[in-house]
Amino acid sequence: MRRLYLSAALILLLAGLSGLHVWHLNGFTSQLTGLLTQAQQQVRQENWTGAALLTREAKEHWMDHEGYLHTTLHHDDIDAILISMDEVLAFLEGGEKQPAEYAAANARLLTQLELLVEAELPTLTNLL
């Protein structure tokens, strides 16, 4: 009977830690999404420098959590988001200001961040 209680306690601990991970990841990606959305608004106001600063801040925030992210998530997903951040920064810091191309790259990055959280949710689709 003791083994049963220990097994149940371990399962509950793992479920709790998984929930904590999803909660933390959701908060983290929400912060990044907020910064990138603000950057998009800066581009609409033709403040490319402000948008670049906000996007760099989002990238630095991402890099600060890279150890945690590599421990808990798929490496391909993490690398794809980092590449997308670099692409968005290239549009912002490039000599030619291309708002449509920037908007498309930024939208793709925002979608990748959203999908990152969705992939961690304990849904039937993710379990199968």
Q: Whereabouts are the PLM-identified features?
A:
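C-terminal-biased regions
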Residues: 1-34, 38, 56-128
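Short extracytoplasmic/periplasmic juxtamembrane "stem" segments immediately C-terminal to an N-terminal membrane anchor
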Residues: 33-50
